[in-house]
Protein backbone atom coordinates (compact mmCIF):
# COMPACT_ATOMS: atom_id res chain seq x y z
CA UNK A 1 0.00 0.00 0.00
CA UNK A 2 1.09 3.43 -0.72
CA UNK A 3 1.60 6.08 1.84
CA UNK A 4 -1.59 7.84 2.74
CA UNK A 5 -2.07 11.55 2.37
CA UNK A 6 -1.12 13.47 5.48
CA UNK A 7 -3.84 15.63 6.82
CA UNK A 8 -2.76 19.23 7.21
CA UNK A 9 -3.45 20.38 10.72
CA UNK A 10 -1.55 21.76 13.65
CA UNK A 11 0.76 19.24 15.29
CA UNK A 12 -0.17 19.12 18.93
CA UNK A 13 3.02 17.51 20.19
CA UNK A 14 5.53 20.28 20.82
CA UNK A 15 8.63 18.20 20.08
CA UNK A 16 7.18 16.77 16.90
CA UNK A 17 6.12 20.24 15.87
CA UNK A 18 9.66 21.58 16.32
CA UNK A 19 11.20 18.66 14.44
CA UNK A 20 8.75 19.06 11.59
CA UNK A 21 9.39 22.80 11.46
CA UNK A 22 13.13 22.25 11.22
CA UNK A 23 12.79 19.69 8.43
CA UNK A 24 10.21 21.61 6.43
CA UNK A 25 12.14 24.84 6.88
CA UNK A 26 15.30 23.29 5.47
CA UNK A 27 13.35 21.82 2.57
CA UNK A 28 11.64 25.14 1.90
CA UNK A 29 14.96 27.02 1.85
CA UNK A 30 16.39 24.37 -0.44
CA UNK A 31 13.45 24.69 -2.84
CA UNK A 32 13.79 28.47 -2.83
CA UNK A 33 17.46 28.18 -3.69
CA UNK A 34 16.74 25.66 -6.45
CA UNK A 35 14.12 27.82 -8.13
CA UNK A 36 16.39 30.87 -7.97
CA UNK A 37 19.25 28.97 -9.63
CA UNK A 38 17.28 26.92 -12.15
CA UNK A 39 14.91 29.67 -13.25
CA UNK A 40 17.18 32.69 -12.65
CA UNK A 41 14.47 34.19 -10.48
CA UNK A 42 14.80 36.62 -7.63
CA UNK A 43 13.53 34.79 -4.58
CA UNK A 44 13.01 36.15 -1.10
CA UNK A 45 11.79 33.87 1.68
CA UNK A 46 10.91 34.95 5.22
CA UNK A 47 9.93 32.46 7.93
CA UNK A 48 9.20 33.13 11.62
CA UNK A 49 9.19 30.27 14.08
CA UNK A 50 6.66 29.94 16.89
CA UNK A 51 9.21 31.56 19.21
CA UNK A 52 9.53 34.54 16.89
CA UNK A 53 12.92 33.60 15.44
CA UNK A 54 13.44 34.82 11.90
CA UNK A 55 14.72 32.68 9.04
CA UNK A 56 15.10 34.12 5.59
CA UNK A 57 16.60 33.44 2.20
CA UNK A 58 17.50 35.85 -0.59
CA UNK A 59 19.19 34.66 -3.74
CA UNK A 60 21.54 37.66 -3.80
CA UNK A 61 21.74 38.01 0.01
CA UNK A 62 20.10 41.41 -0.17
CA UNK A 63 16.68 41.10 1.37
CA UNK A 64 16.40 44.90 1.68
CA UNK A 65 16.62 45.32 -2.07
CA UNK A 66 13.95 42.66 -2.61
CA UNK A 67 11.67 44.31 -0.05
CA UNK A 68 12.15 47.71 -1.66
CA UNK A 69 11.28 46.21 -5.03
CA UNK A 70 8.24 44.58 -3.50
CA UNK A 71 7.18 47.89 -1.96
CA UNK A 72 7.55 49.68 -5.28
CA UNK A 73 5.55 47.00 -7.05
CA UNK A 74 2.84 47.01 -4.41
CA UNK A 75 2.67 50.79 -4.53
CA UNK A 76 2.29 50.70 -8.31
CA UNK A 77 -0.46 48.09 -8.00
CA UNK A 78 -2.28 50.19 -5.43
CA UNK A 79 -2.07 53.20 -7.73
CA UNK A 80 -3.68 51.21 -10.55
CA UNK A 81 -6.33 49.59 -8.36
CA UNK A 82 -7.79 52.04 -5.85
CA UNK A 83 -8.41 50.50 -2.47
CA UNK A 84 -10.08 51.70 0.64
CA UNK A 85 -7.14 52.67 2.86
CA UNK A 86 -9.49 53.65 5.62
CA UNK A 87 -10.57 50.07 6.21
CA UNK A 88 -9.08 48.35 9.27
CA UNK A 89 -7.86 45.45 7.15
CA UNK A 90 -5.66 47.61 4.94
CA UNK A 91 -4.09 49.32 7.93
CA UNK A 92 -3.43 45.96 9.57
CA UNK A 93 -1.71 44.67 6.44
CA UNK A 94 0.36 47.83 6.09
CA UNK A 95 1.38 47.63 9.73
CA UNK A 96 2.43 44.01 9.34
CA UNK A 97 4.57 44.88 6.31
CA UNK A 98 6.29 47.74 8.08
CA UNK A 99 6.85 45.65 11.17
CA UNK A 100 8.41 42.84 9.14
CA UNK A 101 10.66 45.26 7.32
CA UNK A 102 11.72 46.86 10.59
CA UNK A 103 12.61 43.47 12.04
CA UNK A 104 14.69 42.63 8.98
CA UNK A 105 16.57 45.91 9.25
CA UNK A 106 17.18 45.41 12.97
CA UNK A 107 18.42 41.89 12.39
CA UNK A 108 20.79 43.00 9.64
CA UNK A 109 22.05 45.78 11.86
CA UNK A 110 22.89 43.24 14.53
CA UNK A 111 24.65 41.09 11.95
CA UNK A 112 26.77 44.04 10.84
CA UNK A 113 28.06 44.48 14.40
CA UNK A 114 28.69 40.74 14.84
CA UNK A 115 25.59 39.82 16.84
CA UNK A 116 23.04 37.02 16.38
CA UNK A 117 25.17 35.12 13.86
CA UNK A 118 24.03 31.67 15.04
CA UNK A 119 21.15 31.52 12.56
CA UNK A 120 23.39 32.15 9.53
CA UNK A 121 24.82 29.32 7.46
CA UNK A 122 28.20 29.29 5.73
CA UNK A 123 27.03 31.00 2.55
CA UNK A 124 25.20 33.71 4.47
CA UNK A 125 28.26 34.33 6.61
CA UNK A 126 30.41 34.60 3.49
CA UNK A 127 27.98 37.06 1.94
CA UNK A 128 27.95 39.09 5.16
CA UNK A 129 31.74 39.10 5.20
CA UNK A 130 31.78 40.28 1.59
CA UNK A 131 29.36 43.09 2.41
CA UNK A 132 31.46 44.17 5.39
CA UNK A 133 34.65 44.10 3.31
CA UNK A 134 33.00 46.20 0.64
CA UNK A 135 31.75 48.63 3.27
CA UNK A 136 35.24 48.86 4.80
CA UNK A 137 36.72 49.63 1.39
CA UNK A 138 34.26 52.47 0.92
CA UNK A 139 34.97 53.74 4.43
CA UNK A 140 38.75 53.66 3.91
CA UNK A 141 38.40 55.34 0.52
CA UNK A 142 36.30 58.12 2.02
CA UNK A 143 38.69 58.49 4.95
CA UNK A 144 41.71 58.75 2.65
CA UNK A 145 39.89 61.32 0.53
CA UNK A 146 39.15 63.44 3.59
CA UNK A 147 42.75 63.11 4.76
CA UNK A 148 44.10 64.27 1.39
CA UNK A 149 41.67 67.18 1.36
CA UNK A 150 42.72 68.17 4.88
CA UNK A 151 46.41 67.96 3.95
CA UNK A 152 45.78 70.10 0.87
CA UNK A 153 43.99 72.74 2.95
CA UNK A 154 46.80 72.76 5.52
CA UNK A 155 49.41 73.13 2.79
CA UNK A 156 47.54 76.11 1.33
CA UNK A 157 47.33 77.69 4.77
CA UNK A 158 51.05 77.09 5.32
CA UNK A 159 51.95 78.76 2.03
CA UNK A 160 49.69 81.71 2.86
CA UNK A 161 51.30 82.10 6.28
CA UNK A 162 54.79 81.94 4.78
CA UNK A 163 53.88 84.61 2.24
CA UNK A 164 52.43 86.79 4.99
CA UNK A 165 55.55 86.26 7.09
CA UNK A 166 57.77 87.28 4.19
CA UNK A 167 55.75 90.44 3.63
CA UNK A 168 55.92 91.33 7.31
CA UNK A 169 59.70 90.74 7.37
CA UNK A 170 60.10 92.99 4.33
CA UNK A 171 58.04 95.74 5.96
CA UNK A 172 60.07 95.46 9.19
CA UNK A 173 63.35 95.80 7.29
CA UNK A 174 62.03 98.82 5.38
CA UNK A 175 60.88 100.40 8.62
CA UNK A 176 64.24 99.79 10.28
CA UNK A 177 65.98 101.40 7.32
CA UNK A 178 63.70 104.44 7.51
CA UNK A 179 64.30 104.77 11.25
CA UNK A 180 68.07 104.56 10.76
CA UNK A 181 67.98 107.26 8.07
CA UNK A 182 65.78 109.47 10.24
CA UNK A 183 68.16 109.08 13.19
CA UNK A 184 71.10 109.99 10.96
CA UNK A 185 69.33 113.11 9.69
CA UNK A 186 68.35 114.14 13.22
CA UNK A 187 71.95 113.74 14.38
CA UNK A 188 73.25 115.86 11.52
CA UNK A 189 70.67 118.58 12.19
CA UNK A 190 71.57 118.56 15.87
CA UNK A 191 75.26 118.99 15.08
CA UNK A 192 74.49 121.88 12.73
CA UNK A 193 72.25 123.62 15.28
CA UNK A 194 74.70 123.16 18.17
CA UNK A 195 77.72 124.52 16.24
CA UNK A 196 78.58 128.26 16.58
CA UNK A 197 80.18 130.21 13.82
CA UNK A 198 82.13 133.29 15.07
CA UNK A 199 82.57 135.83 12.28
CA UNK A 200 85.41 138.35 12.81
CA UNK A 201 84.15 141.87 12.96
CA UNK A 202 86.72 144.23 11.62
CA UNK A 203 85.68 147.80 11.38
CA UNK A 204 88.05 149.90 9.35
CA UNK A 205 87.09 153.22 10.93
CA UNK A 206 89.14 156.40 10.40
CA UNK A 207 90.26 158.61 13.31
CA UNK A 208 88.37 161.82 13.94
CA UNK A 209 91.10 164.51 13.92
CA UNK A 210 94.41 163.92 15.58
CA UNK A 211 93.37 161.43 18.26
CA UNK A 212 96.80 160.33 19.29
CA UNK A 213 100.17 161.96 19.50
CA UNK A 214 103.42 160.28 18.80
CA UNK A 215 105.17 159.40 22.00
CA UNK A 216 108.71 158.37 22.71
CA UNK A 217 109.25 155.61 25.19
CA UNK A 218 112.36 156.13 27.30
CA UNK A 219 114.42 153.46 29.01
CA UNK A 220 112.72 153.93 32.41
CA UNK A 221 109.25 153.28 30.94
CA UNK A 222 108.06 156.94 31.19
CA UNK A 223 106.31 158.62 28.30
CA UNK A 224 107.78 161.84 26.90
CA UNK A 225 106.36 164.43 24.54
CA UNK A 226 103.09 165.30 26.28
CA UNK A 227 101.43 165.91 29.62
CA UNK A 228 98.87 163.81 31.46
CA UNK A 229 95.92 165.82 30.16
CA UNK A 230 96.97 165.16 26.61
CA UNK A 231 97.28 161.40 27.33
CA UNK A 232 93.80 161.36 28.94
CA UNK A 233 92.31 163.14 25.95
CA UNK A 234 93.97 160.71 23.60
CA UNK A 235 92.50 157.81 25.56
CA UNK A 236 89.02 159.29 25.32
CA UNK A 237 89.16 159.62 21.57
CA UNK A 238 86.57 157.22 20.01
CA UNK A 239 86.96 155.12 16.89
CA UNK A 240 83.92 156.10 14.80
CA UNK A 241 82.17 153.66 12.42
CA UNK A 242 81.90 154.55 8.78
CA UNK A 243 78.15 155.18 8.86
CA UNK A 244 78.58 157.66 11.74
CA UNK A 245 81.26 159.48 9.80
CA UNK A 246 78.86 159.79 6.88
CA UNK A 247 76.30 161.42 9.15
CA UNK A 248 78.86 163.75 10.63
CA UNK A 249 80.25 164.78 7.28
CA UNK A 250 76.77 165.27 5.87
UniProtKB/Swiss-Prot annotation:
Residues of the K-box domain: 88-178
Annotated Gene Ontology cellular component terms: nucleus
Primary residence: nucleus
One annotated GO molecular function: RNA polymerase II cis-regulatory region sequence-specific DNA binding
UniProt keyword terms in alphabetical order: DNA-binding, Nucleus, Transcription, Transcription regulation
UniProt note on tissues of expression: Abundant in vegetative organs.
One of the protein's GO biological processes: regulation of transcription by RNA polymerase II
Domain MADS-box: 3-57
Family matches, as InterPro entries: MADS-box/MEF2_TF (IPR050142), MEF2-like_N (IPR033896), TF_Kbox (IPR002487), TF_MADSbox (IPR002100), TF_MADSbox_sf (IPR036879)
PROSITE patterns registered for this protein in UniProt: K_BOX, MADS_BOX_1, MADS_BOX_2
The protein's role, per its UniProt record: Probable transcription factor.
Protein name: Agamous-like MADS-box protein AGL8 homolog
Organism name: Solanum tuberosum
Amino acid sequence: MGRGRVQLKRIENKINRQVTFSKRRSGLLKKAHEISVLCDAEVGLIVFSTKGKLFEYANDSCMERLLERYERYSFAERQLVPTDHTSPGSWTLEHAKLKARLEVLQRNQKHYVGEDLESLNMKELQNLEHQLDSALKHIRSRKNQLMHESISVLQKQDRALQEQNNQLSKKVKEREKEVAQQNQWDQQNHEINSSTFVLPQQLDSPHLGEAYQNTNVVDNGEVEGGNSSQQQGAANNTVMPQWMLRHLNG
